[in-house]
């Protein structure tokens, strides 16, 4: 059984027991979160596709960790000027473990 849900402007295909890295959620480690915007649920041959969401379906998850991703470097070179500008960015994320899918 797996489901596709939406969080942080992205869609994630998950199954029970899977650990997923999402955009930062303002939750503490160990808290439970429910995602109601489930777009599709598949259980063997039984497929439920929402328009746009499956009514009554939800994905339940537990927050495992909060953290920051790898650094992304942004470099802007100005040709023939011996000048450049560097900038870095580390995006915050939340890791959640999927504990249940209810359809």
Curated annotation (Swiss-Prot):
This is Large ribosomal subunit protein bL21. Belongs to the bacterial ribosomal protein bL21 family. HAMAP family: Ribosomal_bL21 (MF_01363). GO terms for biological process: translation. PROSITE patterns: RIBOSOMAL_L21. It comes from the Bacteria. It comes from Actinobacillus succinogenes (strain ATCC 55618 / DSM 22257 / CCUG 43843 / 130Z). Part of the 50S ribosomal subunit. Contacts protein L20. GO terms for molecular function: rRNA binding; structural constituent of ribosome. The keyword rRNA-binding applies. One of its GO terms (cellular component) is cytoplasm. Keywords: Ribonucleoprotein, Ribosomal protein, RNA-binding, rRNA-binding. This protein binds to 23S rRNA in the presence of protein L20. Pfam families: Ribosomal_L21p.
